[in-house]
């Protein structure tokens, strides 16, 4: 976590709450859903001809091939590509590499860093952190991220434990 400056009580609590929720409290390093819902998501790069080619070469479709991986659930061709370029791990051709603890945790830290989540964590904005992880943007509504109640409970529990 030091590599990505997840190094204060508020940052650690926020980070753990998000990866705790996204991974089913560290039980699942690959999204449980099939990923088919992501097949036509241009915002994830899954309609890119190269994405379609790579997925097909692996007997899959883009949504299924690049469904959520790792404790923060890196999702989609473009996110796997960006993670690969940043971390030097070929999670484009081998997305399940992010299911391995070292690669997955580094990918989660990278995601945290590139999305500026420390800024929100530093002011205790667990709603903003949750929105950015789950929705990709801050929303006006409070608590509308998927699983917000669990994210908040995990955050509160982490704050009590971390001194």
Name each model-derived stretch.
Residues 1-5, 14, 61, 91-99, ...:
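Second-shell loop/turn segments in exported
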Residues 1-20, 24-25:
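Export/targeting segments at the very N-terminus of extracytoplasmic proteins
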Residues 7-11, 64-67, 124-126:
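Extracellular/periplasmic catalytic domains that process cell-envelope and extracellular macromolecules
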Residues 13-16, 72, 106, 110, ...:
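Solvent-exposed, polar/charged alpha-helical surfaces in well-ordered, non-transmembrane soluble domains
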Residues 17-111:
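Peptidoglycan-targeting cell-wall enzymes and recognition modules
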Residues 19-22, 121-143:
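Acidic helix/loop microenvironments that form the catalytic cleft of cell-wall polysaccharide enzymes
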Residues 103-105, 114-121:
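Proteins synthesized as precursors that undergo proteolytic processing into mature forms
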Residues 132-163:
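Low-complexity, Gly/Ser/Thr/Pro-rich intrinsically disordered linker/tail segments
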């Amino acid at each position: 976590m030091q590599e990505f400056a997840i190094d204060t009580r508020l940052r650690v609590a926020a980070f753990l709450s998000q990866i705790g929720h996204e991974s089913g409290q560290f039980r699942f390093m690959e999204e449980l859903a099939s990923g088919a819902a992501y097949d036509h998501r241009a915002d994830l790069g899954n309609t890119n001809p190269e994405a379609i080619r790579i997925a097909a070469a692996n007997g899959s479709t883009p949504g299924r091939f690049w469904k959520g991986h790792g404790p923060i659930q890196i999702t989609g061709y473009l996110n796997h590509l960006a993670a690969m370029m940043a971390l030097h791990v070929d999670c484009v051709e081998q997305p399940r590499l992010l299911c391995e603890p070292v690669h997955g945790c580094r990918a989660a830290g990278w995601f945290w860093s590139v999305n500026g989540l420390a800024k929100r964590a530093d002011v205790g904005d667990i709603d903003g952190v949750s929105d950015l992880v789950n929705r990709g943007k801050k929303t006006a509504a409070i608590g509308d991220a998927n699983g917000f109640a669990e994210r908040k409970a995990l955050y509160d529990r982490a704050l009590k434990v971390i001194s």
